[in-house]
Amino acid sequence: MEEFKGYFELDRSRQHDFLYPLLFREYIYALAHDHGLNRSILFKNAGYDKKSSSIVVKRLITRMYQQNPLIFSANDSIQNPFFGHNKNLYSQIISEGFAVIVEIPFSFSLRLVSSLERKEIAKSHNLRSIHSIFPFLEDKFSHLDYVSDVLIPYHIHLEILVQTLRYWVKDASSLHLLRFFLHEYWNSLITPKKHITLFSKGNPRLFLFLYNSHICEYESTFLFLRNQSSHLRSTSSGIFFERIYFYVKIEHFAKVFFDNDFQCILWFFKDPFMHYVRYQGKSILGSKDTPLLMNKWKYYLVTLWQYHFYAWFQPGRIDINQLCKYSLDFLGYRSSVPLNSSVVRSQMLENSFLINNAMKKFETIVPIIPLIGSLSKANFCNTLGHPISKPTRADSSDSDIIDRFLRICRNLSHYHSGSSKKKSLYRVKYILRLSCVKTLARKHKRTVRTFFKRLGSEFLEEFLTEEEVVLSLIFPRTYSTSRRLYRGQIWYLDITSINDLVNYENDWLLDHGNVNYL
């Protein structure tokens, strides 16, 4: 948000009161399109006239208040690339402007809270790694006994979203326009999914922001967990306000909740071993205490959602399981904490006896069946996991085809580097490698055997994963050591988005080269 500092020269006393006029500033939409963030002059960017202008925005807002439908013909979409960019340009433009504007109060409040607390709030890039959540689970959950898998309600009333922003945005005109906009275009902007958290990648940034603010409202009710819990979050959104403002809203929410009937209930939740983790539309509560405490948590969450957020929350959406007998499926991994028995023979004088030690170990494996299902939908194999040739364009070169397969293979290997067992990952690499050969053979109308002879062993070495290459460079003389390290769990802190192949509930979009932003 530091980029906004040079563009918004507003009086600090009026920052919250005059956000509505910013909708008619052209640099707002330049920022929304990622133009000119690092330049002193915004309007010298090539192709900016194809994006947006204040005149277009004024017409859109006027027509929206008049409730006149804005219809573009096919010819307009062809003549103007900007109008053909989205199926619903009307809602897209307004939402992009809103997305930038509603973040302004958050940026100023962040600096204010930092100065009041006299400490620096953690930067968002230190919290963005998805893999950072697994060391936390490995360290904490191996000592817990029970886990509760909570499915966050996705039927959010639009008025609740607007009221959430009232704590930050004091401009009545902006709130009225936002309320009208949400009621008119909610169905056209939200992808119909099972959960509201599963936004498609083409959806506006505004709704990701609204969802994060809604989750912030929900998570700030965990006042009593602030000193006991760790909050390493992973989210598919590029905006990370929910952790930054977790502590800001605690004081306000404490007054609301401790003045009602929940005050007597909170005394039952004194558990120093309670931990909370959220990922996408689900959250996990882990505890070392008895199932009675977990059932009290269940009752508390159901009451919270029904009476505070006015969302119907069925108790069946919260599953309570014994951790040693339950597997958690999230972020492309299947995690469990099984009991591993270790038998030790002890000798004392002439007597010997066996000691059976039960130890808990956090394990993560790659669920091969969903992963093969995603490869099948992407036409890399059939439903049984047999590699097939993938249709390609006639003008695609052999090097482009090989590079694309290598990129997908390395991204998957990089993402699943924390797997305890690599057997499933080896099978995926085999599918991609053979599918690549069959694709090349289909293009040149030759047999697979012929292409294997033509490519030789160098082609197989190209599918060597990045982790193996790095470890072989670190330990060049001890190959067995590097192989042993590779077979272990390796967590990377540069993965900030879920790979589409392992995000089994989303669409299967594979044309992304960098695992950091797929």
Swiss-Prot record:
InterPro entries: Domain_X (IPR024937), Maturase_MatK (IPR002866), Maturase_MatK_N (IPR024942). Pfam families: Intron_maturas2, MatK_N. One of its GO terms (molecular function) is RNA binding. Keywords: Chloroplast, mRNA processing, Plastid, RNA-binding, tRNA processing. Belongs to the intron maturase 2 family. MatK subfamily. Usually encoded in the trnK tRNA gene intron. Probably assists in splicing its own and other chloroplast group II introns. This is Maturase K. The gene is matK.
